[in-house]
Amino acid sequence: MSDTLLTLRDVHINFPARKNWLGKTTEHVHAINGIDLQIRRGETLGIVGESGCGKSTLAQLLMGMLQPSHGQYIRSGSQRIMQMVFQDPLSSLNPRLPVWRIITEPLWIAKRSSEQQRRALAEELAVQVGIRPEYLDRLPHAFSGGQRQRIAIARALSSQPDVIVLDEPTSALDISVQAQILNLLVTLQENHGLTYVLIS
């Protein structure tokens, strides 16, 4: 069995930039221009580039939110479960839900497991990411930026994903908190055999 989870071959993503008076696109913006990559099980693939170079577009492609304009996007084997951790944890967390519901949101959407099972899983994952279980009934605004990112990571873990895409997961955090989150990601990768795509 291959350890390759995802493969991109000569992938291009173009967006319309200008249309003529008939509504036909005459110019395109080339957000991704001929990229090749492989994502292998258990590794961390780093995507580094300056602002506006297409990193976030690539993240959306990997998550299935965009389709290639040209080239091949290949998921090896069965349907892969992908999760994403965003740059700004507060904007990615539902402000009206208690934290335990946020952590298990992917399971609720998929209609998997009972509420009691989801609550137990939320407590287990909270401990793994360093959130005290007695705080799980609080809303996101009650937590610091670093704690909110830990909650977002726990949510990504709840569906047992094959790949987690991390879109600048520490850039909105203080330096000391950045180190804590990166150390947490390393520990979780070792414990769960996770595969990361880390965008910076």
What would you call each of these model-derived segments?
Residues 48-49:
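The feature captures the beta-strand-to-loop junction immediately N-terminal to the Walker
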Residues 117-134:
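Conserved ABC ATPase "signature" region
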